Amino acid sequence: MTTFGTGTPLAAEVLARRETLPLKPMPVTLTGTEFALVPLDLARDAAILHARSNGEPIALGERVVAAYDAEALIWRFLLDGPFADLAGLAEYLQKQIVAPNGLCLCVRERATGTPVGVVNYINNVPEHLKIELGSIWYSPIAQRTNANLEATTLLLRHVFALGYRRVEWKCDALNLRSRKAALRMGFRFEGIQDAHFIIKGRNRDTAWFRILNHEWPTVEARLTALLARTSPTDAPTPRA
């Protein structure tokens, strides 16, 4: 595809896509080799997600994670959390489920069929054919596995197939793990937006990343190669 510069007229078929994409993304199930993304259901998923994100020991099959610092491993750079009780997490997830311009998906491990994390399409702007991947977190049982790599690949493949031109990834500028992950997966760094938010009583500067539709074929090949040479999930080591 052509690289578009400022002022470049867009083809009629590109402009027409804006009329076909809803503000709230349609529910969808995306299935990969190790993980599947399904619309999050509080009754089905919330209790298990809470049990795997509150700092208490986790056991999943033969894999075990000892007690860990949930704030450090999961919640430090997110808008809310950690959550002492299930009700708090459920309220947080419900806001994402009902967001008028987003879609909340549960990351499920296919081998066990159980939840290990949450990903979202957020800030959907069909008028400009752009969308963001955000509010992403994983239980320590799924960290240092293929979960984020495969989930991100599935999310990107889906929206570029729908005709989006731009997918964004934003994170706290201090979140070095997220910034490193974005670059590894082929997002391009665009800069830092200073004083973007006040979160949990502190200033947040935001690092911006993106992939454009004409870049996607190259990025998809990169992600496919990464998945092919990454070994299947091993027992994770907590990083408390």
What is each of the regions a protein language model found here?
Residues 148:
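Short, conserved glycine- and acidic-residue-centered signature motifs
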Residues 161-170:
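Conserved GNAT acetyl-CoA-binding A-motif
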Residues 170, 188-202:
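Conserved catalytic-core motifs of GNAT/GCN5-like acyltransferases
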Residues 2-145, 158, 162, 202-240:
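GNAT-family acyltransferases
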Residues 169-179:
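Conserved beta-strand-loop-alpha-helix junction that forms the acyl-donor binding cleft
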Residues 155:
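Flexible ATP-lid and adjacent glycine-rich G1/G2 motifs of the Bergerat
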